[in-house]
């Protein structure tokens, strides 16, 4: 069924898998989790901030709630836009630049760390464009820090990242929501 779209009937998460991860790899997963709160659910985003210590301590109730809400956010977005013609593009927040950074760093940073760096760049651009305030950006930066994400990267050249972006980024037509 190549090219077919089917929504899952069930999402199963074995909590013991999370508890087997290294701290850095576990924290890396929060790039996607925090993104869900930022793009769709302020109450959930605030819950992630308020419960960071319980989550990082692998509290089962906190982890179950976090996974449940994040899966539902992603499910809702994908169901509302199965062919990625509008709202689903929100799930790509931080990913375009994040993937370029990931490639240029030869995967020495985890995917979630690179996505957060991409979100940080996007948030900085949003401040410059006036679509969010500096305080909103700083709040997100503080949340990323709660989950121990890097806030900058060294050892790569901006020209190489830009070249990677130009090679891998969607065309302007792909970015349009009016197809």
Q: Positions of the model-derived regions?
A:
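Active-site segments that bind and position negatively charged phosphate/pyrophosphate groups
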Residues: 46, 50-159
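Conserved small/polar residues in nucleotide/adenosyl-binding loops
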Residues: 167-174
